[in-house]
Regions:
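Low-complexity or membrane-interfacial segments used for flexible interactions
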Residues: 1-66, 70-77, 82-90, 96-101, ...
Length: 203
């Protein structure tokens, strides 16, 4: 689907729009690049006109939305669907034909961020947590062994202060990760940004 199988590191870079500089929330768009800055694809939230814009301002990351993921040839290959939820957010990943690949499911936790990566049958493939002493680091574990990691990178003082522009390093630490698992880890980076770093409704 995306050229991820032979990659050790992938960067997900959020692209900001003018409205973000004045505190006005705009749709999410991301570049997906390798560690040399070569584009592997991109992802973009689908705008739903004026109603979508209003819901974004009122509901933030609780709202229903779709993110389309494209390959290097700008062909839509995946869709990440976020259903409306106030609690325990979820991101469902499927092919453009509608075949489910898996999901990212938030779990209850007191002092740290926690979610699971599920396969198409709802079975847990990877467990993910962010240590309380590393709030920008998310470790992906399979059977008590770390196999991947997503880390939020510093975007610069001005961008951090005035916009939601976030950059993430996705590290595939286990060469045995399947193509499906790599796609889900990449999708989890989008989930992390939307859930933990996007401005919440009303702010």
């Amino acid at each position: 689907v995306l050229a991820l199988v032979d990659r050790k590191n992938v960067f997900v870079r959020q692209v900001h729009e003018l409205g973000e500089w004045v505190g006005f929330e705009t749709r999410n768009k991301y570049q997906i690049q390798d560690d040399k800055g070569i584009d592997l694809g991109f992802a973009a939230e689908q705008q739903k006109g004026l109603l979508g814009l209003i819901l974004r301002q009122l509901l933030g990351h609780w709202r229903t939305f779709d993110i389309y993921i494209y390959d290097q040839a700008r062909q839509n290959v995946l869709i990440a669907h976020h259903p409306f939820r106030f609690f325990f957010q979820r991101l469902e990943i499927r092919t453009k034909e509608g075949n489910p690949l898996g999901a990212i499911q938030q779990r209850f936790a007191f002092f740290h961020k926690r979610f699971d990566v599920e396969n198409a049958k709802g079975q847990v493939l990877l467990e993910v947590a962010s240590p309380i002493w590393k709030i920008w680091t998310f470790q992906f574990r399979k059977k008590d062994r770390q196999v991947a990691q997503v880390t939020k990178k510093w975007s610069g003082l001005l961008a951090e202060a005035l916009t939601d522009k976030d950059n993430f390093l996705v590290e595939f630490q286990d060469a045995g990760l399947t193509a499906e698992e790599r796609v889900l880890v990449l999708s989890a980076a989008l989930f992390i940004d939307l859930q933990y770093f996007e401005r919440k409704a009303g702010k």
